[in-house]
Amino acid sequence: MAAALLLCAAPIASAAPGTAEGRPPAHGGAPLYISDYADNVVLRLPPGGAPATVAASGLTRPTGMALDSSGDLYIADTGNNRVVVVPGDGGPQTVVPAAGLSRPIGLALNADGDLYIADSFNDRVVKIPADGSGQVTVPTNGLLHPNGLALDGTGNLYVADFVNDRVVKVPADGGPQTTVPFTALSQPTGLAFDRRGDLFVSDSGNDRVLRLPADGGPQRVVPASGLNSPYGLAFGPAGALYIADFNNDRVVEVPVRGGQRTVPVAGLHTPAGLAVPPGREGY
């Protein structure tokens, strides 16, 4: 678990979205989900509406999230060593049948509905196939407290290897693991791809977010100021990048055309994970 994650709790408060200038919600035309780590809740911020608490029961220190095409929300219930599913149709919460988890954090779903879980304290990534064939351990080498996960357009898996200060790529075809060419990473956490295939990582130990172009160009620093242990990442439908600014108790929006603003949700306490519906991300 990232050193930034604080073992404390506080009551949640919410505020109507919008800004002092009367602009619409920063997240555009799709809901934004935020896991509030210290308050043990997940919030849903709809376009043009007020934030509401997702009906997930018994959460302790929620972190990573993923949404499937049916609107089902997967939540890494880190403190309870499990992953829960909140159905999009309002049905009862269920627990993913994953055995032996210890501090699960990052989640990712592939096009077939298979779920990947960063089983952090077990130093592994596990896969729960959608066909019910049973849990498997993804073949990786040397992971230490894996954190964020992401999948590219061809199904390759990327893992933020937190203690080893690197991001690794696990090819979908079973080829050998490689290290992604980021430089000077410190405690990487969240991962996300934009629609161009550029890979973004929360470089939490350096209080910044990095971007690695898909065309092989050099890494760049995302122009977001004042970050303190950034965590989860997500893209909105208009291409804006959203950053869970963990130790600043806020979510930051970085629009495609530049600038920065704080997403209007009051009362956050160490936001960790972010998610938007599939197919609504990117540029």
Task: Give the label of every model feature segment.
Residues 40-44, 81-85, 123-127, 165-169, ...:
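A short loop-to-beta-strand structural motif that recurs across blades of beta-propeller domains
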Residues 51-56, 92-98, 134-140, 176-182, ...:
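A short beta-strand motif characteristic of beta-propeller blades
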Residues 75-80, 84, 100-122, 145-149, ...:
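A generic tandem-repeat structural signature
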Residues 31-34, 72-74, 114-116, 156-158, ...:
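Conserved beta-propeller blade signature
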Residues 18-29, 58-70, 99-112, 142-154, ...:
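Beta-rich, blade/repeat-based domains predominating
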